[in-house]
Amino acid sequence: HADGIYTSDVASLTDYLKSKRFVESLSNYNKRQNDRRM
């Protein structure tokens, strides 16, 4: 059933993008903390 596969693909892609964005914002936050320390 193509629709089911497509939906799950979109869901996993969304999760992937969300986690990627989370990791990016986390590393940006860490960078800011390090800058403040210097």
UniProtKB/Swiss-Prot annotation:
Principal cellular location given in the protein's record: secreted
One GO term describing the cellular component: extracellular region
Record localization: Secreted
Protein keywords: Secreted
Signal peptide from the UniProt entry: none
Gene3D superfamilies xrefs: 6.10.250.590
One Gene Ontology molecular-function label: hormone activity
InterPro entries: Glucagon_GIP_secretin_VIP
Protein family per UniProt: Belongs to the glucagon family.
Protein name listed in UniProt: Glucagon-like peptide
Provenance organism: Hydrolagus colliei (Spotted ratfish)
Taxon lineage: Eukaryota, Metazoa, Chordata, Craniata, Vertebrata
